[in-house]
Amino acid sequence: MAQMTMVQAINDALKSELKRDEDVLVFGEDVGVNGGVFRVTEGLQKEFGEDRVFDTPLAESGIGGLALGLAVTGFRPVMEIQFLGFVYEVFDEVAGQIARTRFRSGGTKPAPVTIRTPFGGGVHTPELHADNLEGILAQSPGLKVVIPSGPYDAKGLLISSIQSNDPVVYLEHMKLYRSFREEVPEEEYKIDIGKANVKKEGNDITLISYGAMVQESLKAAEELEKDGYSVEVIDLRTVQPIDIDTLVASVEKTGRAVVVQEAQRQAGVGAQVAAELAERAILSLEAPIARVAASDTIYPFTQAENVWLPNKKDIIEQAKATLEF
């Protein structure tokens, strides 16, 4: 075991897979020589060579097309889109081509592509860098969408993503890259895609979240417990597919649920979770399912995001309203 940041854990996972399977290739803008904008791939090109870890032109659609071509010819590509907001430039390749390859080929051609990309607020980026587009990607049939909330999950989920025979979008929250460390095994391990994690057990209310909002939810739970409430916190880990069974089991116990997301409220992951819980656990509910989310506006850039992003205070206020309903 070693203490790692999320950057280090992701780098370690990539290194592990490059060693394990010579068909794994890592590429994207500035991924090779510079080790990526956030130095996530630092040192990999030097260790594994330019044929396996390499830079691409600044053309997201080309990166996606290259990944698909490599995948259907036997490779296991790990492509990086420099920031999630740039996925608009490669959306056809990702959702219209890569995601549909197995279906189009009648199951004869898998597309084992891992699409890595940073996203999320809290680091004051320019426009189109921090956008939360996980809801759009989760609505694209054929894609799995994974969002780790810390270093341990980051390594295990990335290894599972790379070894998957279907395409996985692996979203890395920028605020979490170096914000804290966790004990991470140095050997290979996998975390199942599609399985949520109960981060904290409780009996009065369930907070459901993913990515950086998991940390905010845990902070909120700590404050709520000072007021005598027992709070369960669940990390989705994967927003496509969603582990509804774990969520239903929790809500059947607590009777109350608040879904927390950083993204805009409209048509988000939180709306899907709320709908599923309403369909499957409504008789167990003692209060309406609540959501904490950002405003339905274009993602603000730099300092403006400070008043836009949901935070611990918002979660506490909504949780108390739900508890007192």
From Swiss-Prot:
Gene3D superfamilies: 3.40.50.920, 3.40.50.970. Thiamine diphosphate binds at E60. Keywords: Oxidoreductase, Pyruvate, Thiamine pyrophosphate. SUPFAM superfamilies: Thiamin diphosphate-binding fold (THDP-binding), TK C-terminal domain-like. Its EC number is 1.2.4.1. CDD domains: TPP_PYR_E1-PDHc-beta_like. It catalyses: N(6)-[(R)-lipoyl]-L-lysyl-[protein] + pyruvate + H(+) = N(6)-[(R)-S(8)-acetyldihydrolipoyl]-L-lysyl-[protein] + CO2. Signal peptide: none annotated. It holds the Pfam family Transketolase_C. The keyword Heme does not apply. GO terms for molecular function: pyruvate dehydrogenase (acetyl-transferring) activity. InterPro entries: THDP-binding, Transketo_C/PFOR_II, Transketolase-like_Pyr-bd, Transketolase_C. Its cofactor is thiamine diphosphate. Heterodimer of an alpha and a beta chain. The pyruvate dehydrogenase complex catalyzes the overall conversion of pyruvate to acetyl-CoA and CO(2). It contains multiple copies of three enzymatic components: pyruvate dehydrogenase (E1), dihydrolipoamide acetyltransferase (E2) and lipoamide dehydrogenase (E3). This is Pyruvate dehydrogenase E1 component subunit beta. The gene is pdhB.
